[in-house]
Amino acid sequence: MKIETLEIAGINSALAALRLPFNKEPRSIFNFNLESNDKNYITSYSSATISDDDLILLKTLIKRGDEHAKVVRGIVVWVKITAPIYFFTEEETYRAGHERLSSQSTMHGVAKGLSGEELVKVKSELPMGVELTKVDFFSYQCLRNIVKQRHNHRLPEWHKFVDWIKTLPFAKELIFVGLEELYE
């Protein structure tokens, strides 16, 4: 199994939204800059200095539950995963805060050029252990639910996935808060 973080976004937006329910301004400092120098080149730059007060509020809301921690739905990670079909079948359990952008196609790979019954036969006989590569995105809120529900799973792929989650920025503070024993 291979897991590669492609992009992380939404931290600034989450900070901007954090105190809206309280009719207050964020206490953190954040910047976003996007430049397009020509038709094929884009540079984006994002930075955030999360204030202690905002971090305390984030942790408090996350510990209170998903309905209070809405802003962490906006922090999104795009990831490239190469794993067996059986892992992706289980991963589909997580629909809220998880989407598939694209995946390797068995139609254009092992079943290329086939059609009709021949195609159906080859696809129906694919072993569950065949590895495919997919690009998905997950919200931090979804990743927190995965940690809670899969940290002790029998499949080793889930342990690798949880270990990858630990590598994300602010994972300890925004995903594992209240679950610190699972972070070690």
Model regions and ranges:
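Family-specific signature for flavin-dependent thymidylate synthase
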Residues: M1-E184
